[in-house]
């Protein structure tokens, strides 16, 4: 249903945001930004 679709979208968006945060953090830690 629509709720399932929205939940999946939220999960995907959350994963993407987490991934980019992790990428930023790791590049700052390694000094490669």
From Swiss-Prot:
Q: Which compartments is it annotated to reside in?
A: Secreted
User: How is expression of this protein distributed across tissues?
Assistant: Expressed by the skin glands.
Q: Which InterPro entries match?
A: Antimicrobial_frog_2
A Pfam family assignment: Antimicrobial_2
User: What is known about what this protein does?
Assistant: Shows antibacterial activity against representative Gram-negative and Gram-positive bacterial species, and hemolytic activity.
Family to which the UniProt record says this protein belongs = Belongs to the frog skin active peptide (FSAP) family. Brevinin subfamily.
The protein here is known as Brevinin-2E
Q: What is the lineage of its organism?
A: Eukaryota, Metazoa, Chordata, Craniata, Vertebrata
